[in-house]
Structure formats: structure tokens, C-alpha cells
Amino acid sequence: MRNEMNLSFSAQSQNESFARVTVGAFIAQLDPTMDEMTEIKTVVSEAVTNAIIHGYQGQPDGVVYIHASIDQGVFELTIRDEGMGISDVEEARQPLYTTKPELERSGMGFTIMENFMDEVKVVSEPMIGTTVFLKKHLTKSKAICN
């Protein structure tokens, strides 16, 4: 059986941990391995941080939207903003590429997402926003939604 959740919150950096913990609690019903849980929570942090820092340029009046679903041991996650958008998604997905070189850890967000998830798709349009679609097949699943 499929299970889903939706979450939206202000694009403020302190909400990144809220998003990470909430998604972690949602996938806990799948009984993921510690590595899977850590990877998913890290990906949430990276995508939400990208939305806040790059999408909304740190302006707290934006909203970050998360949709998560689980079905048959497959976890799907969508993180969306209505911010600045990305003019060249392929360039932005290159390791160490950043539009904010002054920030530490810059340029690894998409690389981390690609390494931790089975599928990553980025759809973006300048001045419209960005949506990141992520999918992970969990190795150990005792989910109530199986």
C-alpha cells in the first residue's frame, strides 16, 4: 500500500533540520538501514539548503515544498521551490560548480544527491523555480505499506 506525506515551510535555514527529521520519521516505517537513513536525511538537507540559499537567495519569504511517498520499498521524494531557478541544470550538476563560491561546502549538493539516491532528476526554469525528483530503492523493507 502506498503512503504519502506533504510538507511546506518558510525558506529559512533553521527549517532545514525540521525537514530532515520529518522525512526521516516518515521513512522510519520502512525500517531502513542506518546507511539508508543517513543518506536520505543528507539528501534532504542538501536539496532544502539549495532551495533556501540558491533558489530564494536567502530571502525567508519563500516556501519550500516537500512531497514524499513510499510504495513497495521504494522511497520517492520531491523538493520544490518557486525561486530563482537554474539557467543551466547540467552545468549546475557538475561537481564543485557553484554560484556562491564564498560559502563553504559549496558545489557538492547535486553530487551528493546523485551518489546517495538511485535516481535524480532536476527540472528548473529561471524565475519560476526548481524541482528535484529523487528515488531510492531500499534494501531492507518491512514497511506497513508493503
UniProtKB/Swiss-Prot annotation:
InterPro entries: Anti-sigma-factor_SerPK, Anti-sigma_F, HATPase_C_sf. One of its GO terms (biological process) is asexual sporulation. It is an enzyme of class 2 (transferase). The keyword Nucleotide-binding applies. It catalyses: L-seryl-[protein] + ATP = O-phospho-L-seryl-[protein] + ADP + H(+); L-threonyl-[protein] + ATP = O-phospho-L-threonyl-[protein] + ADP + H(+). It comes from the Bacteria. One of its GO terms (molecular function) is sigma factor antagonist activity. Keywords: ATP-binding, Kinase, Nucleotide-binding, Serine/threonine-protein kinase, Sporulation, Transferase. Its EC number is 2.7.11.1. SMART domains: HATPase_c. PANTHER family: ANTI-SIGMA-F FACTOR RSBW, ANTI-SIGMA-F FACTOR RSBW-RELATED. Belongs to the anti-sigma-factor family. HAMAP family: Anti_sigma_F. Binds to sigma F and blocks its ability to form an RNA polymerase holoenzyme (E-sigma F). Phosphorylates SpoIIAA on a serine residue. This phosphorylation may enable SpoIIAA to act as an anti-anti-sigma factor that counteracts SpoIIAB and thus releases sigma F from inhibition. This is Anti-sigma F factor. It comes from Halalkalibacterium halodurans (strain ATCC BAA-125 / DSM 18197 / FERM 7344 / JCM 9153 / C-125). The lineage of its organism: Bacteria, Bacillati, Bacillota, Bacilli, Bacillales.
